[in-house]
C-alpha cells in the first residue's frame, strides 16, 4: 500500500520560511507544507513559462489561508478546503502558519523547483518577499 503521513515522510526540505515534509509515491510528490510567514512567490517564478508555476496541484488546507494568482483572477483556499490549482499560477499570499498537503507530479515539480532554487540563490542574502 502506498501511503504517507506528516510523521512518516522521509524527506524534509526547508526553504526559508517554507517547511516541506514530503514523499514520492508512484510519480507524485505528496508534500505536507507549512508556510511560516506571508510570501509572494512572484520573484521565484521568473524563468518558468509565463513566469508562472506550470505544475498542477491537488490538495487540502488544514489550517490558515493561501492565495493563488492567475492571469485573470486570484483564488483563495482556506482551512477545510480541498483544492485543485491548475498550471499557470503564482502563490502570492498566505496567512502565516498556513498548513496544507498537496499532490504534485514529481517530474513537473522538479523542473519548477530547479528554476525557483536558482532564483532564490540569486537573491540578496536575507531577503524575502
Please report, for each region that a protein language model flagged, where it lies by residue.
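Ligand-binding loop in jelly-roll beta-barrel domains
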Residues: 87-112
Amino acid at each position: 500500500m502506498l501511503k504517507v503521513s506528516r510523521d512518516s515522510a522521509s524527506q524534509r526540505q526547508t526553504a526559508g520560511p517554507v517547511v516541506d515534509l514530503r514523499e514520492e509515491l508512484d510519480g507524485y510528490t505528496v508534500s505536507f507544507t507549512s508556510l511560516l510567514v506571508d510570501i509572494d512567490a512572484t520573484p521565484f517564478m521568473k524563468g518558468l513559462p509565463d513566469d508562472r508555476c506550470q505544475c498542477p496541484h491537488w490538495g487540502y488546507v488544514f489550517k490558515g489561508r493561501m492565495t493563488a494568482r492567475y492571469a485573470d483572477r486570484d483564488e483563495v483556499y482556506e482551512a477545510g478546503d480541498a483544492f485543485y490549482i491548475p498550471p499557470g499560477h503564482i502563490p502570492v499570499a498566505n496567512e502565516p502558519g498556513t498548513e496544507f498537503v498537496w499532490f504534485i507530479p514529481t517530474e513537473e515539480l522538479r523542473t519548477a523547483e530547479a528554476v525557483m532554487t536558482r532564483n532564490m540563490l540569486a537573491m540578496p542574502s536575507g531577503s524575502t518577499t
